[in-house]
Amino acid sequence: MTKYTEQEQIRRDKLEFYKKFDVVPFKKAYGLGKLSTSDELNKKYGQFAREELEAKKVKKNISGRLITARGPFLVLKDRKGTIQVYFNKKENPELTKIVETFDLGDILWVRGLLMKTHTGEMTVRAQDIQLLTKALKPLPDKFHGLTDTEERYRHRYLDLITNPESRNTFIMRTKIVQWIRDYFNKLDYLEAETPFLHDYLSGAAAKPFTTHHNSLNQDFVLRIATEIPLKKLVVGGFERVYEMGRIFRNEGYDTTHNPEFTTIEFYEAYSNVEGMMNRTETLIKELCKKIGKSKFVTNGVEVDLSKPFKRVNMIDEVSKKTGKNFRKITLEEAIEVAKAYKIKIEKFFTIGHIINALYEELVEPTLIQPTFLYGHPIEISPLSAKSDDPRFTERAELFINTKEYANMYTELSDPIDQLERFESQLEEKNKGNDEASDIDYDFVDALEYGMPPTGGCGIGIDRLVMLLTETDSIRDVLLFPTLKRIKK
């Protein structure tokens, strides 16, 4: 038998009381009339003096969650804010019996005349009040909010009710996502939807989640990127295309990583890595204009997004940090340098892998203000076109306060080179690199029909929202972050 707290039992007992008065505690939304929100009433009627508003006899319908009750005054919270209700018990003796059963958290409907109190607060003088939904559990901590971080994530609905900061963060996330879509739509990009289930591992260096399709009797992986299908669309004539959606990677779990997260990938024919850097920088600066500021604090560090983003070469930076010229170094010499910095040498490591490992160890932690780092080794960039020096590629990553925010290429359009890259990745996988790509013959086949020279970029939406809302944990910008199951 279910055990209820004292407060929960009191609320459930009221259900029997409602039956006697034909009160439906869980109504359907019929006959409510046109509803006004709190901000609509304040914007339209806030300028009127108390006497003027009373003389106008403006009748309105409102709905919201009861968050405060003191004497004859009730405060309801709707999607836009709060609105006060005045209920005179002497004028409504029969209705008073019902109103006195209301609890904080109940969802109410009110019809009445607009008025202002002596302090000038917009108020609805109730002529009728109905219970729409009875809250059978009390709100936490008398509506002062959830303070336990884990509880906030597990019960996001309560977090949104009780914590205005959290609610505002997710409202801003919605706006940022819409602004990003608007940015690309105005540039004549087409939005695409590509499969979540892939029968190959490609598009990024990451460990996948796997699943099995019973009818096809075939294993699939949840997508780790949208790159391959989007580039197939470029082959098909979608010369400007993007997709914003969920990505799944069976990897780390910390303040900047969640197993499922949101990215936008966009591809533009007749562009290159330079064009993608320009697109990305312009997008971020446009978002700053929408928000109304360009300086943000992330993990205690202020970053300025208004200035031109720096552009530095990976090989040059690694060479500076180590004092070794990595353009003219042998594998044996590179291994010795790596060992000096206590970098673990894997079986599949080449000079390119060592450069990448040293860059992650020595350079990444120094990239505070917005910086594009370009010129990655070919070994870690199997989908990127070669630069003039064929050991390196036309690839760039955007870093802000040591974190990667975007990854962009001049896309590899040569199908012969692409197949060789895939084969090299397979060799790495056989040597123990479980993040290496599979051979995607279908993609190679698509390239053989001809893909125009193309620039492509992927941006992590969650991290970008974290930056623009000055939030330090990814779980604070995900409505329902992945959490470890607990036994009830």
From Swiss-Prot:
- Which lineage ranks, top first, belong to the organism behind this chain? Bacteria, Bacillati, Mycoplasmatota, Mycoplasmoidales, Metamycoplasmataceae
Q: Which organism is it from?
A: Mycoplasmopsis fermentans (strain ATCC 19989 / NBRC 14854 / NCTC 10117 / PG18)
What do we know about how this protein assembles, alone or with others?
Answer: Homodimer.
Q: Which UniProt keywords apply?
A: Aminoacyl-tRNA synthetase, ATP-binding, Cytoplasm, Ligase, Magnesium, Metal-binding, Nucleotide-binding, Protein biosynthesis
**Cofactor(s) needed:** Mg(2+)
Catalytic activity as recorded in UniProt: tRNA(Lys) + L-lysine + ATP = L-lysyl-tRNA(Lys) + AMP + diphosphate
Q: Which residues form a coiled coil?
A: none
Location(s) in or outside the cell: Cytoplasm
- One Pfam family from the UniProt entry? tRNA-synt_2
The name this protein carries in UniProt is Lysine--tRNA ligase
